[in-house]
Amino acid sequence: MALPAAPADRRLQPEPDEQLHLNHQDIGELGLPQEPDTEGIPLHSPWTFWLDRSLPGTTAAECESNLKKIYTVHTIQSFWSVYNNIPLVTNLPVRWSYHLMRGERKPLWEEESNAKGGVWKMKVPKEASSLVWKELLLATIGEQFTDRCAPEDEVIGVSVSVRDREDIVQVWNGNASVVAEATVLEKIYELLPNTSFKAVFYKPHEEHHAFEGGRSRH
């Protein structure tokens, strides 16, 4: 799916400290429609933007309570409305993350619709984080990974997490048992040939030591 160019942005500016105060009032001020958007070029499926802060040692309940839903987009136009009006990745404080998930699923390992899947995880230089995030978002909503997954699998999300030295990008899939058939990483390298990825690996959610078998963290 070819996506139109982004309109001019009007971003919220984050607080200067380690707290990013993007509350429901702020989200309302983004100028997004209050009802699901139906006008414009439809996406193949809806996608939901999420924001959270990840801290070591948090419980599953704390992880879920830290999640803040930004908006569910149904069209290319509403995607750009959200993307252009939330703080840049480079303005997020350390340990904060953005996620874009298929439908309204949450970026939690044990969410029922996620539990059998996993993520391709990689470190990226901070100066490349914004470009990598944008390109992976566009590839994801444009369904460019469809023919790179096994027939019984799909990409269900993408995340970017800010860390001290290098940031972390993750691409989520729904079925870890068939990941050997996937060429998702090859597609990522094709999309971003000039990016130096480090510590690249795939990990099923169920192999995380903190996987709780119910609903948990990311």
Curated annotation (Swiss-Prot):
GO molecular function (one): RNA 7-methylguanosine cap binding
Organism: Xenopus laevis
Binding site for mRNA: W109, E110, R163, D164, R165, E166, D167, I168
A Pfam family recorded for this sequence: IF4E
Keyword Transport: no
Protein name, as recorded: Eukaryotic translation initiation factor 4E type 3-A
Domain of life: Eukaryota
GO cellular component terms attached to this protein's record: eukaryotic translation initiation factor 4F complex
Annotated keywords: Initiation factor, Protein biosynthesis, RNA-binding, Translation regulation
Biased composition (Basic and acidic residues): 8-21
Subunit structure: eIF4F is a multi-subunit complex, the composition of which varies with external and internal environmental conditions. It is composed of at least eIF4A, eIF4E and eIF4G.
A single GO BP: translational initiation
UniProt cross-references to InterPro entries, sorted A to Z: TIF_eIF4e-like, TIF_eIF_4E
Reported function: Recognizes and binds the 7-methylguanosine-containing mRNA cap during an early step in the initiation of protein synthesis.
